[in-house]
Structure formats: C-alpha cells, structure tokens
C-alpha cells in the first residue's frame, strides 16, 4: 500500500474563493491565474472548479495547451508573453492572448506571418522593475504594435509591487497614476488588479479595470498575511496536506529526537512519528513548535524535519496513536483548519512556496 501522505484538492473551496473575488469586483472580468501548475494543485485538478472565470492566465504554452485540451474555448493569456518567435504560431493557432513587454517581442510579431490576428496585452513597468516598458517608452511601444497588421487587439496591463505590503494604497496610487497617465486616451481594455489589490482595494475607482488577475486568493491563502488571515478575507483552504502517525515513542526527561538532537524533552513526553518529510515538500527548516493538527487537535512539531519523517508532540492529543490523522496544513476531517500561511511563517517563507513545493511522489485527490 502507498505511504499515507496525501494532498487533497478541495473543489468547493476553489469555487468559493472565485466567487469571493467576484463579490469584491463585480464589474470586472476575471483571469484565473493557474501558473506554476495551478500553484502546485495541478491544472487538471482545478479546471472544472475554476471554469466559471472569464479566462485563464499562465506563463507558458505547455500550460496553455493543457487548458485548451481540457475543452476551454475562452480567453487564455500568457503573462510573460512568448519566449521565442516560433511560439507565435501556436498562439495564433490556439487563439492565445499574450503579453508584450519588450522590443524583441514586437520585432518577432512584425516578422511573423499569420492570417489570424494576435490579441496582446502591452505591459507597463510602472514601478515593479521586472518586465514591461517604462511610462516614457510605453506609448511608442503601443504605436509600433498598433501599426502591425499581425495585431488585432491591444489591451493594457501593469503589476503592483506593494499591494500586499506596508506601502498599500499609496504604493498602488503612484503606480496607477503612471499607468493612467500613459494610457488614458488609448483604446483598449485594462488589467491591473492582482490578488492583494483586488481584495484590499475592492471595487475602488483607482483599481477598477476591465480585468483582474487573482492568483493566490483562489487557492485560499491570504495575499497580505500576517496583516490579515485567510479567514479575514473569507477564503477557504483549497489544498490539504495530510498523513498518518506511523510510530509512537515515549520520551523521558533529557532524551532527544531526530538528527542533530535539536529537541530535548524537559520531562515525560509522548511523541508521534509522521510519514512526511522534506522529500514530500514539507519545509525542512520548520523547527520545533511549527503548528500541526493531530486528529484535528492543534499541537506542534518536534526537532528536525528529515527526508521522509517528522515528529509531533502528542501531549495535547492523548487518544492519538498509530494511524491517527495528521494535518500538515489545510482542513482536518473534523473541520478544524490549519492555515498554510501559519506553517509558511514558521518556515520563514510564503504559502505560495509550500503549495508549489508539494513533491510529485505525493498522491493527489480531488474532493
């Protein structure tokens, strides 16, 4: 029989979170962002639950092809555009929209021979300083695209650097001002709102655009944790990583556990060994005290996470033993929830990373 570790994808939670975004921006169309294999959930596992979106957005053509193969006939957007000229042929054939963020991509379009016009999102670098044309160069890039017979439709986009951080509204306002100054009289749809801007600013006039691009919120993680929890935003966990107790040890005072003896018992302590380790995607740098649920009861990890196992304190769960359910993050069978953001905080990272890091050897199921 397989190891008891399992990742469960919750379809109802995905639908709930999508609707939560709809409520925040009722007048906008939604790109459901499924990059990084739907944040580690698996595109095929989330597609049915998210097909209520107006479009799907991702990074590469392989993911776009998978969405088309699942039967999606609506808009698909490549958020980073094409990576080489030959990608344009597949974009044309599969009717895939793509971002344009540099002169090279415009050059490739100009040289591309096609009978099907391309729909593009011209990206502005309004302050993120990763991809896009600066405000000073943006209109010239638009003019080049607008002159190309290969381009059927031009829309406009930018990406916020501080929507989830302390800069908050002032940071958003500065970037939006640059974006609006450069595009205010240009025809075409606009897209600016990421997860944090969509929930934190809602249907504010500053961020109201034709399209929003929710990502992490669809998967039940707070876009601005620890300022706000997922529960604050009425988001539900869409991924549960669970396993079982496969061994029980009784420690006495002075005994330690695991590599490096990083935890030493200060008195009698009952310990459970869990079939989950860093080779499954659980963060190795989670130390003693990382929250975990056993039979739906909150307790803590003990010592060092090893490749295939970790240890938990069974003191708060006296009825736990061999085979007891362990929830590493997500929803336990009794309905108790351990937010992925709390585990990520203990590991010094983000919920995004934990979702994406679940290893291929962990079986996935959909409920």
Swiss-Prot record:
Question: What InterPro entries is this protein classified in?
Answer: Ala_racemase (IPR000821), Ala_racemase/Decarboxylase_C (IPR009006), Ala_racemase_C (IPR011079), Ala_racemase_N (IPR001608), Ala_racemase_pyridoxalP-BS (IPR020622), PLP-binding_barrel (IPR029066)
Which GO biological process entries does UniProt record here? Answer: D-alanine biosynthetic process
What are the positions of the active site?
35 (proton acceptor), 259 (proton acceptor)
Point out residues bearing the modification N6-(pyridoxal phosphate)lysine: 35
Q: Does the keyword Thylakoid apply?
A: no
**Which stretch is the leader sequence?**
none
Annotated residues for binding of substrate: 130, 307
UniProt keyword Isomerase present: yes
Pathway it works in: Amino-acid biosynthesis; D-alanine biosynthesis; D-alanine from L-alanine: step 1/1
What protein name is recorded for this chain? Alanine racemase
Organism the protein comes from: Delftia acidovorans (strain DSM 14801 / SPH-1)
């Amino acid at each position: 029989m397989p190891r008891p570790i399992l990742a469960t994808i919750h379809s109802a939670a995905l639908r709930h979170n999508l609707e939560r975004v709809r409520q925040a921006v009722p007048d906008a169309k939604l790109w459901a962002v499924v990059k990084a294999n739907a944040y580690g959930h698996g595109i095929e596992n989330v597609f049915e639950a998210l097909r209520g979106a107006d479009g799907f957005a991702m990074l590469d053509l392989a993911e776009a092809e998978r969405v088309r193969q699942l039967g999606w006939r609506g808009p698909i957007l490549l958020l980073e555009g094409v990576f080489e000229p030959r990608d344009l042929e597949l974009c044309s054939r599969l009717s895939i929209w793509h971002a344009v963020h540099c002169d090279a991509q415009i050059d490739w379009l100009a040289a591309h021979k096609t009978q099907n016009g391309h729909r593009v999102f011209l990206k502005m670098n309004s302050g993120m300083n990763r991809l896009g044309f600066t405000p000073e160069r943006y209109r010239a890039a638009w003019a080049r695209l607008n002159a190309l017979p290969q381009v059927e439709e031009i829309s406009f986009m930018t990406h916020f650097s501080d929507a989830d951080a302390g800069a908050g509204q002032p940071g958003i306002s500065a970037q939006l001002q640059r974006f609006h100054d450069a595009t205010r009289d240009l025809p075409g749809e606009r897209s600016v709102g990421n997860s944090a801007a969509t929930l934190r600013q809602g249907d504010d006039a500053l961020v109201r655009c034709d399209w929003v691009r929710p990502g992490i919120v669809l998967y039940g993680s707070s876009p601005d944790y620890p300022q706000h929890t997922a529960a604050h935003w009425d988001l539900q966990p869409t991924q549960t990583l669970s396993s079982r107790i496969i061994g029980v040890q009784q420690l006495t005072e002075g005994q330690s556990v695991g590599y490096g003896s990083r935890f030493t018992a200060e008195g009698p302590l009952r310990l459970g060994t869990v079939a989950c380790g860093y080779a499954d995607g659980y963060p190795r740098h989670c130390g003693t005290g990382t929250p975990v649920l056993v039979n739906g009861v909150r307790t803590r990890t003990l010592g060092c996470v090893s490749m295939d196992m970790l240890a938990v304190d069974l003191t708060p769960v006296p009825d736990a033993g061999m085979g007891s359910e362990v929830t590493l993050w997500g929803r336990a069978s009794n309905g108790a929830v351990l937010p992925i953001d709390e585990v990520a905080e203990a590991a010094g990272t983000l919920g995004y990373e934990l979702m994406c890091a679940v290893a291929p050897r962990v079986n996935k199921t959909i409920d």
